[in-house]
Amino acid sequence: MKLGFLTACMPERPLSEVVHVATTAGYQMLEVACWPRSGERDHHASHIDVATLDEAGAREIRGLMERQGLAISALAYYENNLAADPNERAVVNGHLRKTVDAAQLLGVGLVGTFVGNDLSKTPTENVEEAATVFGELTAYAGERGVRLMIENCPMVGWQRPYTPGNLCYAPAQWDALFARVPDLGLNIDPSHLYWLGVDPYAAARDYGAHIVHAHAKDTEILHQRHARIPVLDDGWWRYRMPGLGELNWPRFISALQEGGYDDVLSTEHEDPVWEGAPDRVDGGLILGQRFLAPLLYHPS
């Protein structure tokens, strides 16, 4: 298993600088953020402009990675592919296709996204809509030698307060979509499952046939706040770097391996204690790498 990180934690820095940080901190892989340059929401970045990438640009990026001994585990564009507004949905789906095209140029086999949610429809209707939308998107990706994967953040409050903005955030929803779109992969993130009360270790073991990528992000329950703040509200938990929260990482990694996954563990840095100035962000990534690296098997 190799360690990487999602580059969305460094939105203001160019890819060349991100690569330098990765090699200095001991990472081997990068999950490269590919949101549009005009993106406005948090936890996003545009380290590859997929709208303008051509073969020459792809060759330059491949060379940068190779010179530093790194590889790209996936391209990342996590947005609402089921947006209720047809124009917004067309833009999101179109950018996802461009991200797939970029992956093909770069020789990258995975592109990550969210399913999203159309809040004008029922959950059952959304599953059927997702099957249609992702049936077309996975076919587009497959024709280009790329596999789409979905991540399981519920995105509560993304479109409406107290409401999940991402349809497929737990095993029950995964089952419904994978039954309809079997070529879709899963980028499993245990941090969301933990605060939702879903067993992340069982999910890692039981969904090995679908897991193609894994995020490393921890969760800390703020118990004094939770004594006053109900489950449906926020502020009673927060994301942390691996090892600074409550997840049992040896157990999670073992469950992944037992389920048949042994590829990339990609740190998603959303730790508020280690955000802000570049040296704080870098420090968080270094802490995560130092904690996770001893837990992984490194063949001689």
Where are the regions a protein language model picked out?
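N-terminal small/glycine-rich loop or linker at the start of catalytic domains
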Residues: 1-4, 72-83, 231-233
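Short beta-strand segments at enzyme active-site cores
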Residues: 30-33, 72-76, 109-115, 147-152, ...
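Glycine-rich, proline-tolerant flexible connector loops at the mouths of alpha/beta enzymes
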Residues: 33-60, 121
